[in-house]
Structures are given as C-alpha cells and as structure tokens.
C-alpha cells in the first residue's frame, strides 16, 4: 500500500472504522494528535494519565527518568481482518552502528562494534538503554519481556515505519490524516477519502 501509494483498498476504510470507534468511545486523549515527543510521553504516560501508548520498544528508555518503576507490558497489534497481516508481522530497524566508507580504521571500528554488541557488553547496552539486545542469546530487559515474545514470534518483517518515511508526501499524508482521525476531525470515510488524494 505505502510502497505503491495506493490507499484505495477496503482495508483503509476498515482501519479508519477501528480508530474512529476508539475515538468516539473516549479511548484516545483529546490532545493525541498534537502530542510531540517528549511532552506526550512524560505528561501522559509517565504520570499515569494514559493507560496505553501506541509506540515502540524504545519508549521505556525514553521515559525511564520520569517513570523508573513503571510496570511495562507490550502487545502486538492484531490483524484487522483474516486476509491481512497479524501479530506475526512487525517492522524492525530503528538504530544501527555504521562505519564511514572513508575510514582509515574500518577494521578496528568493525571489531569494536562486534565487541560492543556481543556478550556482556551487549547485555549491558540493552540493560542500560532498556533496549533490544543484538545477540539472540543475550538477556532482555525485564521491561521488554512481552516484546521479546513478539519479536521471537515474528515471521514477516516490514521495513522501518513500514516504508512510509521513504516518501515525504506519503509520510505527510499518513501523519496528517491519522492525526485528524484519532481526534474525530475525520470520520472513517473522510479518512479513507483523504488517503486517496
């Protein structure tokens, strides 16, 4: 859908109906569309005003200073319909280490990256950043225990942000219309219509 900029399928309207229903029932805070990092996380999650936050595994790290004792839990977004992707499908790839192609010490840099992402240093990096470890056999932070089950069950991987950030126009269209949907400015139908423009 994103790759081809084709939002004409029935799943767009179905998606809109789900979020329109949540907005009508009051499940979404009124200022959700204008929540900008880090204010929304600190004001709403860390203070306990919101019970749930649509985000990623990096959130516990981002607000650990404001909510060090938070009891974290994660779940995979369920399939919207039997024909769509379900909890087996997730996106990966938010951070990485890189070596400049012009580096005179590329081999040393690579060995350092290996050193930092294996064994005790991988576990320490994961523990202190409350992040996903690199190695499959490293211990995960307790805050991400549920996320580990999700990642371990993933059989289909999407590109980062499902590819929406590859196109500024598509990115803007999704962000603008989704923001309007979750605060009730768009109905499911007007959301679906706007996504085809």
Regions found by a protein language model. Give the residues of each.
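Short, solvent-exposed loop/beta-turn-alpha elements that line the ligand-binding surface or hinge
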Residues: 1-14, 65-66, 79-88, 139-145
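Glycine-centered hinge/linker elements that transmit conformational signals in sensory
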Residues: 2-33
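Extracytoplasmic/periplasmic substrate-recognition and gating elements
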Residues: 25-28, 65-129, 176
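Short helix-initiation/N-cap motifs at beta->coil->alpha
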Residues: 31-46
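Beta->alpha turn/N-cap motifs
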Residues: 38, 55-60, 77, 93-95
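Pocket-flanking alpha-helical
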Residues: 42-44, 60-66
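Alpha-to-beta junction loops
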Residues: 46-55, 70
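Long, aromatic- and glycine/proline-rich binding clefts that accommodate carbohydrate-like moieties
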Residues: 68, 126-180
